From Swiss-Prot:
PROSITE patterns: FN3, HEMATOPO_REC_L_F1. A motif (UbE motif) lies at residues 336-345. This is Growth hormone receptor. Belongs to the type I cytokine receptor family. Type 1 subfamily. It holds the Pfam family GHBP. Residues 19-260 are extracellular. The gene is GHR.
């Protein structure tokens, strides 16, 4: 029966799949071991205290030995009670261990004659004819080289501080291994530690027999040991003897450890503190930081206007606010030459009635009646805003007429001619005008700077011709519009106008000579309601010198005052007006509509359309200042 089982085992082990090559693979060994366990199920059990294999080892890949333990059964401890058998591919039967003595007690040694590399082996332990343990392996898988020998070390160098040193550790491969011939390739692993430490430090495996060790302390002692293994395997052999490394005694002061500033700790604590500070800053100022990083989208609004007015649809109040502020004024109002502004003084309520235009309008005083037509010159010497159709070429002629005219500063002038006197004398051609030249003196009335100034109604020559025609016709006097009188401005921006009144005056009758009047009226050319230097010379040449001591010669002391032709013609007819008391009523102008409230002290009025004849473009000339007029006057 045993022979039959042995033959079956050999048949399985010698199959073509298992032994197809010259060497056995681990898979084959596993399959062989499984086959043996199937054939001999008694080998699987070893829990009764029977002997068992502990290890099988080959130190140089030429020989190997197997060891087992003693069993707990004392009957098996007698010599010859435990036997080991082995089988391999080239033999067809189990053979007993060739040497029970060389490897020691409870061991079996296989010398080179019984060792075959890359050949699987199966071994078993028997006691009294029964199998107690078994094992299958290949020789190359059980290689565990002997430890290296001849360890020593050499000092390489010492640091300048005499604190650290570098050494080189050397050893020799196991003497029983044929490393030089390349029969076996070994890898070495070095372990070291300080003398009083328990934990060994390990270096990376290397295939050389020497390794340097750096930065060893001169005041310390070190222990070094080395072990080896076959390349591409995981089982190391035993460690070599421990090598003690002791450096020669150095100067104690040189061996003192140099002080090292704890930069690492300071950097770590600094980073930690900075992170905490930044976190607290962000946590406390998160709203502000959010506003800086992500600013809110501004709500659409207009400066100075409550958004609720737009939501409630109060467009009238919005338009009023836009009209008051200059910033929101349309360009149309800036470019419109037919719009004039009235400046108001509402600082002192007592000054509103003192010397106002209403008093001058209602007064019968001759001097106040002439102030009605005073005007503020906002053009500062430019062409009047009431002549938008004058060609640009006229301005060049005006600049070349009088090079010494002062046109750089804004001027303020009040004066009005008695147009009705001259008009009536031209119609009647009365011979009683011989005494008129004595009274034809230019008159200039200065206006206080802090008082409200009425708007000057004047413009082109055609406009004055229309006014002359209306004044000569009593039935059309009631339709003349001059300006509107503003009495107060409410806090809401509303304007209160004074009621219309009329001054009673007689029909003007002048005693001036018709020849003088005719020549004066014919020679004056009105250009922008200012007095030209050429016209002034003509007027002075034509006006006869009258010795009237009661008349006061006009003096022009205020600088930058311009003379209008109407002011000069008014002086010519003033004496006749004083002698004759008119019986007709000169109408106070009707109220004109207010276009918009520009500012707390300014109004924008609608232009009054007067009947204009066909436009006639007249050449303009330079303006005459008061100083120049005084020089050319006789």
């Amino acid at each position: 029966m045993d022979l039959w089982q042995l033959l079956l085992t050999l048949a399985v082990a010698g199959s073509s799949d298992a032994f197809s090559g010259s060497e056995a693979t681990p898979a084959f060994l596993v399959r062989a071991s499984q086959s043996l366990q199937i054939l001999y199920p008694v080998l699987e059990t070893n829990s009764s205290g029977n002997p068992k294999f502990t290890k099988c080892r080959s130190p140089e890949l030429e020989t190997f030995s197997c060891h087992w333990t003693d069993g707990a059964n004392h009957s098996l401890q007698s010599p010859g009670s435990v036997q080991m058998f082995y089988i391999r591919r080239d033999i067809q039967e189990w053979k007993e261990c060739p040497d029970y003595v060389s490897a020691g007690e409870n061991s079996c040694y296989f010398n080179s004659s019984y060792t075959s590399v890359w050949t699987p082996y199966c071994i078993k332990l028997t006691s009294n004819g029964g199998i107690v343990d078994h094992k299958c392996f290949s020789v190359e898988d059980i290689v565990q080289p002997d430890p290296p020998v001849g360890l020593n070390w050499t000092l390489l160098n010492i640091s300048l501080t005499e604190i650290h040193a570098d050494i080189l550790v050397k050893w020799e491969p196991p003497p029983n291994t044929d490393v030089k011939m390349g029969w076996i390739i070994l890898e070495y692993e070095l372990h070291y530690k300080e003398l009083n430490e328990t934990q060994w430090k390990m270096m990376d495996p290397l295939m050389v027999t020497s390794v340097p060790m750096y930065s060893l302390r001169l005041d310390k002692e070190y222990e070094v040991r080395v072990r080896t293994r076959q390349r591409n395997t995981e089982k190391y052999g035993k460690f070599s003897e421990v090598l003690l490394i002791t450096f020669p005694q150095m100067n104690p002061s040189a061996c003192e450890e140099d002080f090292q500033f704890p930069w690492f700790l300071i950097i770590m604590f600094g980073i930690l503190g900075l992170a905490v500070t930044l976190f607290l800053l962000i946590f406390s100022k998160q709203q502000r930081i959010k506003m800086l990083i992500l600013p809110p989208v501004p709500v659409p609004k207009i400066k100075g206007i409550d958004p609720d007015l737009l939501k409630e649809g109060k467009l009238e109040e919005v338009n009023t606010i836009l009209a008051i502020h200059d910033n929101y004024k349309h360009e149309f109002y800036n470019d419109d030459s037919w719009v004039e502004f009235i400046e108001l003084d509402i600082d002192d309520p007592d000054e509103k009635t003192e010397g106002s235009d209403t008093d001058r309008l209602l007064s019968n005083d001759h001097e106040k009646s002439l102030n009605i037509f005073g005007a503020k010159d906002d053009d500062s010497g430019r062409t009047s805003c009431y002549e938008p159709d004058i060609l640009e070429a006229d301005f060049h002629v005006s600049d070349m007429c009088d090079g010494t005219s002062e046109v750089a500063q804004p001027q303020r002038l009040k004066g009005e001619a008695d147009i009705s006197c001259l008009d009536q004398k031209n119609q009647n051609n009365s011979p009683s005008n011989d005494a008129a030249p004595a009274n034809q003196q230019p008159s200039v009335i200065h206006v206080e700077e802090n008082k409200p100034r009425p708007l000057l109604i004047g413009g082109t020559e055609s406009t004055h011709q229309a006014v002359h025609h209306q004044l000569s016709n009593p039935s059309s006097l009631a339709n003349i519009d001059f300006y509107a009188q503003v009495s107060d401005i409410t806090p809401a921006g509303n304007v209160v106008l004074s009621p219309g009144q009329k001054n009673k005056t007689g029909n003007p009758q002048c005693d001036t000579h018709p020849e003088v009047v005719t020549s004066c009226q014919a020679n004056f050319i009105v250009d922008n309601a200012y007095f030209c230097e050429v016209d002034a010379k003509k007027y002075i040449a034509l006006a006869p010198h009258v010795e009237a001591e009661s008349h006061v010669e006009p003096s022009f002391n205020q600088e930058d005052i311009y003379i209008t032709t109407e002011s000069l013609t008014t002086t010519a007819g003033r004496s006749g007006t004083a002698e004759h008391v008119p019986s007709s009523e000169i109408p106070v102008p009707d109220y004109t509509s207010i276009h918009i409230v520009q500012s707390p002290q300014g109004l924008v009025l609608n232009a009054t359309a007067l009947p204009l004849p066909d436009k006639e473009f007249l050449s303009s000339c330079g303006y005459v200042s008061t100083d120049q007029l005084n020089k050319i006057m006789p």
